[in-house]
């Protein structure tokens, strides 16, 4: 019975003169999401509302599922919309709507009319009262409750009239692309895909870089990361995944540097490489899944040491999350089951038994100096031979 959806948004509504830019971005994201659904749809905005009108047969559950992944949407309202053929005809439509959506017809209700078209002959208060009277006459077992109704019956009077009573939750946030672009350091673990999701929710378009270490990490480990990128892409749109062969760099660091500093020094080179790719692709920052104190490389001292090599800002959406909170988000967005597949990352292969937790930046720099010009050549080769994979849902 539903042929349209009214899209609600929250934060966009408090924007100033540039609000239309955010609305236009949200319309684009909705159109992109619906391309993967059966059917034809018209997406349009009018007077602080965005509507999705189905122009052919469609799968209701499929459309709702795709809309619930579009950042910027706070609510999705399946609506019945009709032409204005007079108030009596509107009452008949509403009574029929209640019979189909709430067949028991014994709930409490409230009518909430919004008259966006000011030349409509009844004002909002009169619509509420007259419609309530018609409903009570048709369904004597129903009762009015203006404070805590079972059914909030919304009627929007525009060029057409829209009727809805259900608001399905959206993901919230801001439309992807309105917050700039960032480079995500993506691994096969639980944290980094969640970090990508969280930063994208704030409107940031993400690319990603993955550090692969064959033969120490398998093709299955690489495919796992590609699969994670595809899952995150359900929410973000296509992700350009840059795959770096990190093996020679890791082996050289392992040979030349103290083993307790391996993780920090390797991490610093990952940040350098990610930043170089980020600058080439017009990213405004790096994004990681780090959380304070979770592992040795994520103490505040360690984060200072890794930040020191970057000119771009480093965004850490999970910095104050504990592990269980991160797991809960990963389960919600669908990455958890893939993240726990038992394929090793490059960071887990070359791990010291006793990694330093309070690295001294001056000491780290001195040990990096031992890597001489060869490390620059290895980095250059890694960048020249990187693989680009476009991950789409």
Question: What are the roles of these predicted feature ranges?
Answer:
Residues 184, 208-210, 243, 288, ...:
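Structural beta-sheet core signal
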Residues 233-234, 238-261:
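S-adenosyl-L-methionine
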Residues 189:
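Conserved G/P- and acidic residue-centered "switch" motifs that form tight phosphate/ATP-binding loops
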Residues 1-183, 193-239, 248, 308, ...:
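RNA-binding accessory domains that recognize and position tRNA/RNA substrates
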Residues 133-135, 172-179, 250-251, 255-328, ...:
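Active-site adenylate/phosphate-handling loop in enzymes that bind or generate adenylated species
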């Amino acid at each position: 019975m539903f042929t349209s959806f009214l899209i609600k948004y929250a934060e966009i509504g408090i924007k100033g003169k540039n609000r239309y830019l955010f609305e236009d971005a949200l319309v684009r994201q909705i159109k992109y999401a619906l391309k993967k659904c059966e059917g034809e749809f018209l997406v349009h905005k009018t007077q602080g509302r965005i509507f999705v009108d189905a122009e052919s047969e469609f799968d209701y559950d499929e459309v709702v599922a795709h809309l619930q992944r579009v950042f910027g949407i706070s609510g999705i309202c399946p609506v019945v919309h009709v032409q204005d053929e007079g108030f009596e005809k509107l009452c008949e439509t509403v009574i029929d709507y209640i019979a189909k959506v709430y067949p028991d017809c014994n709930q409490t209700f409230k009518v909430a009319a919004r008259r966006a078209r000011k030349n409509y002959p009844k004002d909002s208060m009169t619509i509420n009262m007259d419609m309530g009277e018609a409903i009570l006459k048709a369904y004597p077992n129903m009762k009015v409750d203006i404070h805590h109704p079972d059914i909030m019956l919304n009627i929007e009077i525009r060029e057409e009239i829209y009727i809805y009573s259900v608001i399905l939750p959206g993901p919230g946030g801001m439309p992807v692309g309105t917050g700039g672009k960032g480079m995500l350091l993506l691994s096969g673990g639980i944290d980094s895909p969640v970090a990508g999701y969280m930063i994208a929710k704030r409107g940031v378009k993400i690319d990603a870089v993955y550090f692969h270490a064959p033969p120490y990490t398998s093709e299955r480990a690489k495919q796992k990361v590609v699969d994670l990128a595809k899952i995150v892409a359900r929410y973000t749109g296509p992700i350009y995944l840059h795959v770096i062969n990190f093996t020679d760099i890791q082996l050289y660091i392992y040979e030349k540097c103290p083993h307790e500093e391996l993780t920090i020094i390797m991490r610093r080179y990952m940040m350098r490489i990610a930043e170089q790719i980020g600058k080439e692709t017009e990213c405004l920052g790096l994004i990681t899944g780090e959380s304070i104190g979770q592992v040795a490389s994520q103490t505040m001292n360690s984060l200072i040491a890794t930040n020191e090599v970057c000119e771009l800002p480093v965004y850490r959406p999970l910095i104050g999350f504990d592990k269980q909170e991160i797991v809960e988000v990963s389960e919600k967005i669908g990455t958890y089951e893939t993240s726990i597949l038992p394929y090793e990352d490059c960071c887990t292969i070359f791990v010291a038994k006793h990694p330093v937790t309070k690295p001294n930046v001056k000491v780290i720099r001195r040990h990096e100096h031992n890597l001489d010009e060869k490390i620059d050549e290895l980095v250059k080769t890694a960048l020249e031979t990187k693989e680009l994979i476009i991950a789409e849902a």
